[in-house]
Amino acid sequence: MDGSGTGSRSGVESILPNYKLGRTLGIGSFGRVKIAEHALTGHKVAIKILNRRKIKNMEMEEKVRREIKILRLFMHPHIIRLYEVIETPTDIYLVMEYVNSGELFDYIVEKGRLQEDEARNFFQQIISGVEYCHRNMVVHRDLKPENLLLDSKCNVKIADFGLSNIMRDGHFLKTSCGSPNYAAPEVISGKLYAGPEVDVWSCGVILYALLCGTLPFDDENIPNLFKKIKGGIYTLPSHLSPGARDLIPRMLVVDPMKRVTIPEIRQHPWFQAHLPRYLAVPPPDTVQQAKKIDEEILQEVINMGFDRNHLIESLRNRTQNDGTVTYYLILDNRFRASSGYLGAEFQETMEGTPRMHPAESVASPVSHRLPGLMEYQGVGLRSQYPVERKWALGLQSRAHPREIMTEVLKALQDLNVCWKKIGHYNMKCRWVPNSSADGMLSNSMHDNNYFGDESSIIENEAAVKSPNVVKFEIQLYKTRDDKYLLDLQRVQGPQFLFLDLCAAFLAQLRVL
């Protein structure tokens, strides 16, 4: 027990009656972490106690809420588990998985560069966890050894989702965040990015650190560091195996559109070597996991006094209560203790459901096989590699971007749509049905005007306040096969009006 006062201790224990609190594991900027024991099962947990006032003073409410939202969703052997959230007017209590072997960062500092098999084992676990995030439309954006925790068996647990973002179809992120040494060039440059590819870059930096004991991009001078990252300037030590020397450069490609994807990493010969059975297939999504209930553990929880029907309904609906917390604590600790480390759960999914092809993973923005990957060292993967997609987001064209944008502006003018330029190939738009062109806008359609610094828009206040106003964004981006994709995303307004507008917009275009 720590030295906190009896009054505060009894207060906390009244809020957490199902746990026996132990010592303080650490103290942070807006809270502390205590070890605790779940009363019914005896399993250890870590309880984060976050002070609401400190969170608000540090303007960290959004970061904390984001992490809670994401961790509540996730069930994966290599992502830290959140079992329960208890809120009071003064504090937020997060009951989380307890891991006791520190950070991967400290492990690397202590051991230096790792043997290839050990590094590969860590990397396989990291990629599995990151792939699970992407399948659930979450980009971590701050992957680094400091955010990778180790349990007693040296299994990786991805933590700290405070900087993560939920991905939305057709929407691009532009928030620069994360640690500079691990951040992708497009992130530190403030460019638009779809998400998954920035995690791939960070994983490449982590793999380099595991195998080399140093960082590929490092400089005390931040401008020099950014210059190295933007230029992709680093050296590969001679001790690396041919497989590692092939994979790392594929991950540390400056152009995100040419960077290897998670499905392609999975199929790389170096990654495939000694791949554990439970990591050999993509993990089930959260919906599949909620439907699958372990009958033996269910009965064990029922024997503790919980109602069977209520427990099953709560598990299927992912409802947090004493019964479901008890169930998941037993489930996780049982599989963790087994030699397969959750292998049984993943194997059951593999055998009980159709195998999802790696190409179905979230990839950014359009997934295609990289040329040369299958020819590496003469290894023929045949049907294992991701098949090229038959579909893509948005409207495709091989026309020049300037020509495309000029036609877009002409179509917007014909449809009486207001637009505001955000970047050369990104704009915000507003449309009100049955509004005249004179009342809505006065746009110059000369292409030099669009590619200049001005946004050509003059609006009518009455039109802006219309209940039928439709707001949307237009984004043009380049694909790997030298085509261009034009994507429209509704931001606000009636869905059917937006679809009508899209149909009319498509009919107006001459280059797509």
UniProtKB/Swiss-Prot annotation:
Tissue: Isoform 2 is widely expressed, especially in newly developing tissues. Isoform 2 is expressed throughout the seedling, with highest expression in leaf primordia and vascular tissue, and the seedling root tip. Isoform 2 is later expressed in developing lateral root primordia and developing embryos within siliques. Isoform 1 is widely expressed but at very low levels.
Enzyme Commission identifier(s): 2.7.11.1
Region of interest (Auto-inhibitory domain (AID)), ranges: 290-389
Impact noted for substituting residue 390 to R: Abolishes sumoylation
Alphabetized InterPro entries for the sequence: KA1/Ssp2_C (IPR028375), KA1_dom (IPR001772), Kinase-like_dom_sf (IPR011009), Prot_kinase_dom (IPR000719), Protein_kinase_ATP_BS (IPR017441), Ser/Thr_kinase_AS (IPR008271), UBA (IPR015940), UBA-like_sf (IPR009060)
Phosphothreonine PTM sites in chain numbering: 175
Location of the region described as PPI in the Swiss-Prot/TrEMBL record: 390-512
Region (Regulatory domain (RD)) residue spans: 294-512
Gene3D superfamilies in the cross-refs: Kinase associated domain 1, KA1, Transferase(Phosphotransferase) domain 1
Effect noted on mutating residue 175 to A: Abolishes phosphorylation by GRIK1 or GRIK2 leading to inactivation of the protein. Enhances sensitivity to submergence
Keyword Transcription among UniProt keywords: no
GO CC, one annotated term: Golgi apparatus
Domain Protein kinase as annotated: residue spans: 19-271
The reaction(s) this protein catalyses: L-seryl-[protein] + ATP = O-phospho-L-seryl-[protein] + ADP + H(+); L-threonyl-[protein] + ATP = O-phospho-L-threonyl-[protein] + ADP + H(+)
Record keywords: ATP-binding, Carbohydrate metabolism, Chloroplast, Cytoplasm, Endoplasmic reticulum, Fatty acid biosynthesis, Fatty acid metabolism, Golgi apparatus, Isopeptide bond, Kinase, Lipid biosynthesis, Lipid metabolism, Nitrate assimilation, Nucleotide-binding, Nucleus, Phosphoprotein, Plastid, Serine/threonine-protein kinase, Transferase, Ubl conjugation, Ubl conjugation pathway
Effect annotated for changing residue 175 to D: Enhances tolerance to submergence
SUPFAM superfamilies on file: KA1-like (SSF103243), Protein kinase-like (PK-like) (SSF56112), UBA-like (SSF46934)
Protein name, as recorded: SNF1-related protein kinase catalytic subunit alpha KIN10
Native organism: Arabidopsis thaliana
Name of encoding gene: KIN10
